Every structure is written in structure tokens, then in C-alpha cells.
């Protein structure tokens, strides 16, 4: 109940672009951009809680698409991979995006380096994620 699968994530900003993660060779050779990257959204009383995979499409693209699909502006929280590894302009702009959207709960997991988590935590509290973590969403 109140769960939405987002499907393929469109590119909605100018700082998160897909990068090929490899090359697939079948009858011909082509780059693999992981077009099947997606997320799940819980629509609760207080807003949206987003559960991501690796976020190859970009965490901000995923959040923007979730807001559009669910017709809701408030993001209560995000858990999953954010696909952020380096201290970069992309990370800086992602942190700015998180702040502008007043995201209450951030749970970066896999596909986020320690340096990136520490940089995010300077501006926004980052919750530690581990085996057995329970998050109650209403």
C-alpha cells in the first residue's frame, strides 16, 4: 500500500549524467548505461521516503522523478546507494540539492564513499546504515 515503483529514471538536471559501466557484446557491441536503474517510493502522511539501488541515474534525478510521479514535493527520507565517490562538483551540487529540498533523513549505503558521506554530513546529518537497521515510515 502506498508504494510506487518508478521504472526508468529520466535525466532531469545538468550535473548528473549516466556513464557507461561497461560494454555489452552480443550481435554487436554497445555501452551499458544501466537504463534499468530505478527506485521504490513510499508515500506516507508526512511525504515521500525513497529506496534506491545504486543510483546510476543520479540520486537527484531519482528524487525529482519521484516528486513528479507521486505529485508530492516533501521528501521525508532517502536510503540506498547514491553513486557518489569523489569530492567533486557533482557532490557539491547534490548536497545543495539535498539542502534546498529540506530532506530530513539521509541513509547513504553502498555506492557512496566514506569521503562523500563525511562531506554530506558537514551540511546534513547522515544516518549510519548496517545489518539489522529498522526504519519506521508512516
Where are the language model's segments positioned?
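Active-site-proximal loop/helix segment associated with metal-binding centers of metalloenzymes
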Residues: 1-45
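Cap/insert and terminal regions of metallo-dependent hydrolase folds
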Residues: 33-39, 43-50, 54-130
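Short, charged, surface-exposed secondary-structure boundary motifs
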Residues: 16, 86-88, 135-138
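Residues at the C-termini of beta-strands that transition into short coil/loop
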Residues: 9, 130-131
Amino acid at each position: 500500500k502506498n508504494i510506487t515503483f518508478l521504472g526508468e529514471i529520466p535525466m532531469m538536471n545538468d550535473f548528473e549524467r549516466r556513464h557507461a559501466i561497461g560494454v555489452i557484446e552480443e550481435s554487436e557491441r554497445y555501452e551499458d548505461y544501466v537504463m534499468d536503474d530505478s527506485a521504490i517510493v513510499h508515500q506516507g502522511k508526512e511525504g515521500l521516503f525513497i529506496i534506491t539501488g545504486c543510483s546510476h541515474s543520479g540520486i537527484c534525478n531519482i528524487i525529482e522523478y519521484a516528486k513528479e510521479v507521486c505529485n508530492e514535493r516533501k521528501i521525508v527520507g532517502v536510503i540506498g546507494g547514491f553513486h557518489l565517490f569523489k569530492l567533486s562538483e557533482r557532490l557539491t551540487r547534490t548536497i545543495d540539492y539535498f539542502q534546498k529540498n529540506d530532506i530530513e533523513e539521509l541513509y547513504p549505503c553502498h555506492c557512496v564513499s566514506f569521503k562523500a558521506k563525511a562531506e554530506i554530513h558537514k551540511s546534513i546529518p547522515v544516518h549510519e546504515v548496517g545489518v539489522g537497521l529498522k526504519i519506521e515510515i508512516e
